[in-house]
Amino acid sequence: MAHTIYKNKNDKRLKSVTTIINGNLGWNKGALIGWTRKHCLNGDDSMKLLKEAGRIGTLAHKMIEEYINGGSVCLDDYTPNEISQAKTAYYGFHKWFEDNDVKFYETELKLVSEQYQFGGTMDAVCEVNGRLILADWKTSSDIYSEYLIQLGAYRQLYTEYHNYDHWYKIKGATILKLNKEETGYEQHHYKIKDLNWGWKMFKLLLKIQENKR
């Protein structure tokens, strides 16, 4: 899957939220190192497994987006195992959707911050049980603090997109952790104070990025 290219109004290419986080946040490396070590000791090809996990997550996101907006997903480029696990994650999303009163306003929204010079793509802005939130779908085995930093940055993107008119309307955020092995989901809810922390951390990472040589 091709990476999204973000450009500002002067046609300058900008780094994405995930690139800035992954390239500058030191504490998010431990989990990946531990995961890689575990699979290497088991004789697994850790890079192959990591690539496969990314493809499964991408496919699950596509399935969710097509369900929300209508349409179908081409499965030709995916293996049977990737399709099976992505479908399991998708079924978890569908169960969450049926368990709650959900109204979607935006999905896969690609935005650029002219003020802070970065770009990002949000999974969804939706109303869940009467609360307007940012929603993010994750197929990872755990929830990590950098996800909250990511959401803090997305909130900034969204509020700039609406000229700050919607700042007070966003009530929080939800990370929906989707199981790839058996149908199910976990909801991780975050308040405005949590998003404020995430944005504070992201601005520090921006400073590091700006001062790199």
Placement of each model-derived feature along the sequence:
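Metal-dependent nuclease catalytic cores that hydrolyze phosphodiester bonds in DNA/RNA
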Residues: 1-119
